[in-house]
């Protein structure tokens, strides 16, 4: 089973990716992990990627694509995989398609966890964290018992810079501009499956399993 996982920041992709990986016994492949591994192991692609990053430049598509190709040819991908964070653009999706076609393979489904912008804003801007012990809270869904204080150590909880309304809106705008053409790409290929991400975590996973089926 070969799956592409799509969804906005704050949609819970990481949580669902872990559950899908465990349920269907396929590796969860994130571009972040691929980059870190290549760079830490000083592979030729890792060295090339790091040279761009050190100069404050974006890593070219071809480098990312080649890293993903290398990863998909490893033994643990023989029975499928879950791609998270790739493809991000139609160009990358086309490159993935071409690579799979050469191997007489194809993506089984592009799984979109769909969550309205307002819901994401509430979910992400409400997050709070304790800088001392790392405990996580949410001002609406899981607030600390003592207003503004960590239940575990008593420190003041804070909002991370990534969770401010301005930052979240910027990330969502980037996501929409980048991902809508990608959603249309998979929709036109009749490979897109959509899940309501506003449900409870277990309900989202149940919906995903209905789409993917019961076979491992």
UniProtKB/Swiss-Prot annotation:
Residues that coordinate or bind ATP: 10-15, 127, 136-137, 199
Function: Catalyzes the reversible transfer of the terminal phosphate group between ATP and AMP. Plays an important role in cellular energy homeostasis and in adenine nucleotide metabolism.
PROSITE patterns: ADENYLATE_KINASE (PS00113)
UniProt binding sites for Zn(2+): 130, 133, 150, 153
Pathway linked to the protein: Purine metabolism; AMP biosynthesis via salvage pathway; AMP from ADP: step 1/1
Catalysis performed (reactions): AMP + ATP = 2 ADP
InterPro entries assigned: Adenyl_kin_sub, Adenylat/UMP-CMP_kin, Adenylat_kinase_CS, Adenylate_kinase_lid-dom, P-loop_NTPase
Entry keyword set: ATP-binding, Cytoplasm, Kinase, Metal-binding, Nucleotide biosynthesis, Nucleotide-binding, Transferase, Zinc
Stored CDD domains: ADK
A single BP term in Gene Ontology: AMP salvage
Subunit structure: Monomer.
Source organism, top-level taxon: Bacteria
Pfam families: ADK, ADK_lid
GO function terms (MF aspect): adenylate kinase activity; ATP binding; zinc ion binding
UniProt keyword annotation of Zinc present: yes
GO cellular component: cytoplasm
Location in or out of the cell: Cytoplasm
Region called LID, residue ranges: 126-163
Protein family: Belongs to the adenylate kinase family.
Region (NMP) location: 30-59
EC number annotated for this UniProt entry: 2.7.4.3
Annotated domain remarks: Consists of three domains, a large central CORE domain and two small peripheral domains, NMPbind and LID, which undergo movements during catalysis. The LID domain closes over the site of phosphoryl transfer upon ATP binding. Assembling and dissambling the active center during each catalytic cycle provides an effective means to prevent ATP hydrolysis. Some bacteria have evolved a zinc-coordinating structure that stabilizes the LID domain.
Name by which UniProt lists this protein: Adenylate kinase
Positions bound to AMP: 31, 36, 57-59, 85-88, 92, 160, 171
